[in-house]
């Protein structure tokens, strides 16, 4: 494959190393691998707000720091290219989910913020696009990293 995307998966698996090996196996030389995982600080806040969050079956079993994800790629022979943060508006939603863990979707605050995110996704108004760009470096929910498989 010329490009492989592994989005929000590695935090769920028992062996990220085995997963990376398989992703590299199917990637052509010169191909690009894009990895995204929950960003360390926003994810840590989720773990602190709710003891149940990290214990959910099939849920997140680890939190990656920037350098850990970068090392996972480079020790497997990939060339690090770049990174960015994403989903600056999404961290508060997950914090609300964790804060109101027992009632989650029934919580007024969770429901209202979810409506806001759906509205933003569908309408993409300039105000929230700018707000998202401002928030991403501070509280972006996801870390997205790009690697290249050597030729």
Predicted regions and their residues:
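Secondary-structure boundary/capping signal
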Residues: 17, 31, 53, 80-81
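Conserved SAM-binding loop
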Residues: 1-46, 66-73, 145-149
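Acceptor-substrate binding/catalytic loop of class I
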Residues: 51-68, 85-86
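Short, solvent-exposed loop/helix junctions and linker helices
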Residues: 13, 63, 137-138
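A generic fold-level signal
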Residues: 32, 56, 138-140
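Short, flexible active-site loop motifs that bind/organize anionic cofactors or intermediates
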Residues: 9, 59, 79-82
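A C-terminal cap/extension of S-adenosyl-L-methionine-dependent methyltransferases
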Residues: 48, 81-151
